[in-house]
Amino acid sequence: MFAEYGVLNYWTYLVGAIFIVLVPGPNTIFVLKNSVGRGMKGGYLAASGVFIGDAVLMFLAYAGVATLIKTTPVLFNIVRYLGAFYLLYLGAKILYATLKSKGSEVAHDEVPFGAIFKRALILSLTNPKAILFYVSFFVQFIDVNAPHAGLSFFILATTLEVVSFFYLSFLIISGAFVTQYIRTKKKLAKVGNSLIGLIFVGFAARLATLQS
C-alpha cells in the first residue's frame, strides 16, 4: 500500500506507529489529566496542541532541522533544557495546587481553556528527541529513490497523527467518564493529581539527562 508513492512496508509501519503511540509520555499524561480535570473540551484542546506541535516537528524533521539539532550540541541542549524546565514547572504547579488544597478538597488547575492548548503546544515543541525520532523512524519506510520523498513523508506523518488522534480520543472519552466517578472520591482525586505531578517531574529529570 502506497508503494507507488515511495512508502515501503506500510503495514509494518502502521503496526510500529500504533505501538509507539501507546508508549506513555508527557503529552499523553497531559491530555489525560485535562480530560479528567476539565472534561472532553479540555482533553481535546490539549490533544489539539499535541497534534499541531507534532505536525510542526515532523515538518522540521523533513526540512532538515533535525540534522542541524543533532550536529549542534548547543542547540540541542538549549531545546532540551527548555523542555525539562517546562515539564518541571508543570509538575511543580500540579503538586503545589494539590498540597495547598484543604482537607480532602480536590485541587484543580483552573487555567483558561486557551491556556490548555498553549501548554500542550509548548510541551510538544520543546522535545528535541521527538524531531530526531521522526527522522530515524520515517527514513526506514521511505524509498530514497522515489521521485517525491516529500509525499512519502507526508503519508507517514499523517498516518501517525491519525493513530494518535484515535488513541487520545479513547483517553479523553475514558477520562470524561472517570471525572464523574472521582467527583465523589476526593481523596482519590488528590492522590491522582499528586501522582501526575510526580510523573511530570520524572519526565523533566529524564529529558534533562538525555544525550543527543
Swiss-Prot record:
Tell me the organism.
Citrobacter koseri (strain ATCC BAA-895 / CDC 4225-83 / SGSC4696)
Q: What does this protein do?
A: Exporter of leucine.
Q: What is this protein called?
A: Leucine efflux protein
The reaction(s) this protein catalyses: L-leucine(in) + H(+)(out) = L-leucine(out) + H(+)(in)
> Which domain of life does the UniProt lineage start with?
Bacteria
Q: What is the lineage of its organism?
A: Bacteria, Pseudomonadati, Pseudomonadota, Gammaproteobacteria, Enterobacterales
Predominant location of this chain?
Answer: membrane
Gene Ontology biological process: L-leucine transport
Q: Name one GO cellular component term.
A: plasma membrane
TM spans (from-to):
12-32, 49-69, 72-92, 120-142, 153-173, 188-208
According to its UniProt record, where is this protein located? Cell inner membrane
